[in-house]
């Protein structure tokens, strides 16, 4: 049946009216969303945006902790400057680059181990067994303990004279003499990684467990009926399905690891062999009272983290919503 011109015009008018109502509803929802989110944005600007802007500004000055109101604008001299043919500044400081390497190494190793262990723990906790709820609560205890408390606790456990770790290894005959875990350059950073893995693996397990619980159960029933090996089910079914959530968890955890401060500072203080970028910035700002140089280090930390976030999101092709492109 062929529609008349009047009917076509009426149909088009109805579609336009419907689209207009949807557009008006969308605009209303957007306005409501902005109204609700505006207070949060204002608070974020006050507690995060303003300090960040001040830090970036101070990085271009010669401000010191003794005279925060008496400083001069010096441009990029805190970052890189040439005086009588000699290059000076943050980018020429070997301690800065050592702290960058320590931070990147710590992040890569700790996040990798935590992701693997967190996945294993999440798979175990996702299974059905008696006392599963209690076990889930127990697993979260290390993550719930404040970082400083965890670091002090492990500092005593790793003590070369009174620590339980050395005592146990000596009794088992694994070592012949006590090891200075946090003072030895060969073991200090590994000790920090070990403590961080103990504390943060439950966090990764929690995020991965949440992703596992959202998976449909019928695919596993089908795999069980077909007699597919559980290992193959994990790599062919489970891992691809939780990949977006896993990538988001890795990004969030890497962000946290890149700004590590308290764990390293409590365990090893200002040791050059374990100094992170945040510890270096604190040393310049507090110990040396160089606000300009400390602010420059903090600004570079911000830029490095921001760059790595962009790279990770592009490489993993993951949106913050957890959907892959």
Question: Locations of the language-model features?
Answer:
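Short, Lys/Arg-rich, polar N-terminal cytosolic tail immediately upstream
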Residues: 1-27
């Amino acid at each position: 049946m062929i529609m008349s011109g009047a009917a076509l015009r009426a149909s088009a008018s109805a579609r336009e009216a419907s689209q207009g109502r949807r557009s008006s509803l969308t605009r209303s929802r957007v306005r409501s969303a902005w109204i609700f989110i505006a207070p949060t944005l204002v608070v974020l600007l006050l507690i995060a945006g303003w300090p960040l802007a001040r830090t970036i500004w101070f990085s271009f000055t010669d401000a010191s902790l003794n005279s925060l109101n008496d400083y001069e604008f010096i441009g990029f001299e805190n970052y890189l400057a040439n005086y009588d043919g000699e290059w000076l500044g943050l980018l020429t400081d070997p301690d800065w680059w050592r702290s960058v390497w320590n931070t990147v190494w710590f992040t890569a190793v700790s996040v990798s181990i935590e992701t693997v262990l967190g996945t294993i723990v999440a798979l175990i906790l996702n299974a059905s067994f008696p006392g599963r709820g209690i076990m889930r609560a127990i697993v979260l205890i290390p993550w719930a303990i404040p970082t400083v408390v965890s670091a002090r606790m492990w500092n005593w456990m790793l003590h070369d004279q009174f620590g339980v770790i050395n005592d146990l290894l000596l009794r088992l005959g694994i070592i012949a003499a006590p090891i200075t875990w946090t003072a030895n350059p060969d073991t200090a950073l590994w000790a920090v990684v070990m403590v961080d893995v103990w504390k943060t693996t439950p966090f990764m397990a929690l995020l991965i467990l949440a992703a596992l619980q959202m998976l449909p159960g019928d695919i596993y029933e089908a795999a069980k009926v077909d007699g597919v090996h559980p290992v193959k089910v994990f790599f062919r079914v489970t891992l691809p399905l939780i990949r977006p959530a896993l990538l988001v968890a890795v990004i969030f955890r890497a962000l946290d690891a890149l700004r590590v401060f308290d764990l390293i500072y409590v365990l090893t203080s200002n040791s050059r062999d374990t100094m992170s970028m945040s510890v270096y910035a604190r040393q310049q700002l507090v110990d040396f009272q160089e606000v300009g140089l400390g602010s420059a280090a903090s600004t570079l930390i911000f830029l490095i983290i921001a760059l790595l976030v962009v790279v990770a999101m592009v490489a993993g092709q993951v949106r913050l919503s957890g959907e892959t492109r």
